[in-house]
UniProtKB/Swiss-Prot annotation:
Gene designation: secG
Protein name: Probable protein-export membrane protein secG
NCBIfam families named in the record: secG
Annotated membrane topology: Multi-pass membrane protein
Entry GO CC: chloroplast thylakoid membrane
Keywords annotated in UniProt: Chloroplast, Membrane, Plastid, Protein transport, Thylakoid, Translocation, Transmembrane, Transmembrane helix, Transport
Main localization category: plastid
Spans traversing the lipid bilayer: 1-21, 54-74
């Protein structure tokens, strides 16, 4: 149970950092100057980050439900 809580804490911290560090979309012409191609093209990077964030959110909720069930039972 301690290991599951640790994973849950790490996922929550990582989600908060991803959400805060992402560059907002549709900034106008200034977004062309600030976009970087660290992981390939900006579209594929954005798609990867969207999918990765969605997977982390789903895993966060599943771990939270499991921890809640474990605290109710035991």
């Amino acid at each position: 149970m301690l290991f599951l809580k640790l994973i849950w804490l790490l996922v929550s911290i990582f989600l908060i950092s991803i959400i805060y560090l992402r560059v907002p979309r549709n900034q106008g012409l200034t977004s062309f100057a600030t976009k970087s191609d660290l992981l390939g093209s900006p579209n594929s990077t954005e798609k990867f980050l969207n999918n990765f964030t969605l997977i982390l959110i789903i895993s966060y909720y599943l771990i939270a439900v499991k921890l809640n069930q474990m605290s109710i039972i035991g």
